[in-house]
Amino acid sequence: MLLIAAFFLGLLFGSFLNVCISRLPKGESVVHPRSKCPKCGASIRWYDNIPLISWVLLRGRCRDCKEPISWRYPLVELATGVWFAAVIFEVWARSPNEMSIQLSGEWWAVHILTSLGLVILGFLLIGLMVMDWQTMILPDSFTLGGIAIGLFLVCTQALFLGPNEDQIVLSNHHIQLTSPGGVTDHGNLFFTGPESLIFGRIGAVCGAALLLLLIRWIYRAVRHRDGMGLGDVKLLAMIAAFLGFWPAILSLFFGTLAAAVYGAVLLARGRAVAASRLAFGSFLCIGGLIASLFGNQLINMYIALLR
């Protein structure tokens, strides 16, 4: 029942996501005016705007001008619905230790915050994937806004850390620390509580952005042209804000792999040349979706292979 509810909720958000995809790259408001047919300009009636159902009943055509309605609309709605259901299944059907975003503390807070973070990230990634593919634009309202949301969720997560994760650790005997109880000792100071979680995630955002900026600079120095835009840098930083540094690197790996395979297919078919541009952000979004649900499992499998 919960999966069905999540799926239908995802359909509703997918319908709104279609509005964002159509308007944000043009700099238009997503609130007004009302949605209209891009061909004839007729306003879309509320009963013609029901996710999936209206498209099927209208047989994929505008009620007024009979022009075809793009397949993108039902596909985005369906993808968002499936994503919402997949997140609920992954988070609520598995142990918290196997989640893509791991927390401890109150179990209900763990599940709710993890679910919320993943559905928001998936919503943003699906939208950015389509927008970059169609327009080569990654709007700041999604990327920078996503970074802000991800960091806000991390700060909220810090409120629900378990008691064993809110400690101060001393080691190596380099500095002196006096505790409120009057005990004096020497050592390095390590935070394992809220400070570690929050500053660790901020560091992940900065690290991911700097890494892609470095790759961008090296590519420009070697090829004498830009290989990726700053939007891709902000996109990877957004993924890191939600998932952390290593899942973001995993996203970069899968995104690069997918882009390389797609580019090789285009070259083999003669549909592109070496200098052709690819919507790398779209492939990075695919990598982000994979890392969101399976990132920790894949990283743990890789570590196990190295042992």
Language-model regions, residue ranges each:
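Long, highly hydrophobic alpha-helical transmembrane signal-anchor segments
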Residues: 1-25
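Alpha-helical membrane-inserting segments
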Residues: 17, 21, 83, 87-91, ...
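Membrane-proximal soluble regions of multi-pass membrane proteins
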Residues: 17-72, 280
